[in-house]
Amino acid sequence: WLLAANINLVGAETELVSVVGREIILREAMQASQDRFDFCLIDCAPSLGLLSLNALAASQEVLIPLQPHFLALQGFGKLLQTVDLVNRRINRDLKVSGVLLCMFDTRASLPNEVRADIERFLENARGSACAWADARLVPTFIRRNIKLAEAPSYGQTIFEYDPTCNGAEDYRRVAQFFLGVET
């Protein structure tokens, strides 16, 4: 299953504010249907609001997509703090499994510097009690590609819109990595 974020969720956060147990609504709904899927990907907006909290409460693993620039690193730190908090208070099974670099510009030096920083950070966490102690940097990355921005405007996935573009190839490699499929 893929639970994708979309514009229709805009009002959901406001509606959930007054609901008792609001941070575990998604987990309860998924538990009621867990025999219907082998795994589920939950796409969250880049925020740390109630919907993202629900996704963290319902998940076992977190894959963090990260743009390789300074401001994204600040958000990365805040997200890790939130994951740690959710792990301690709501969902003891929650772990960060990896970081996936997105919108990677192979012509610039900054993305490679950020990549090295993330690798060092994750290596330093090994053996600790934090929720990202076993996380790894995904060995492939999603290159900057205009086709990835165009596909949703046509109501299509990248695999429908342009299955041979760099973006589709990159996402295919990421899926193969997580499924353990040799390329």
Q: What is each model feature region?
A:
Residues 178-183:
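Short, hydrophobic alpha-helical segments
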Residues 151-176:
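C-terminal boundary of histidine-terminating zinc-finger modules
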Residues 5, 140, 144, 163:
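Active-site donor-binding loop signature of nucleotide-sugar glycosyltransferases
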Residues 1-35, 90, 94, 104, ...:
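P-loop/Walker-type NTP enzyme "switch/lid" segment
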Residues 2, 39-41, 156:
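Residue-level preference for the first positions of well-ordered beta-strands
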Residues 25-28, 78, 82, 113-117, ...:
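Alpha-helical elements of Rossmann-like donor-binding domains used by nucleotide-donor carbohydrate transfer enzymes
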Residues 136, 141, 147-157:
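Long, well-ordered amphipathic alpha-helical subdomains in the mid-to-C-terminal portions
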Residues 34-140:
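Conserved catalytic-core segment of NTP-binding enzymes
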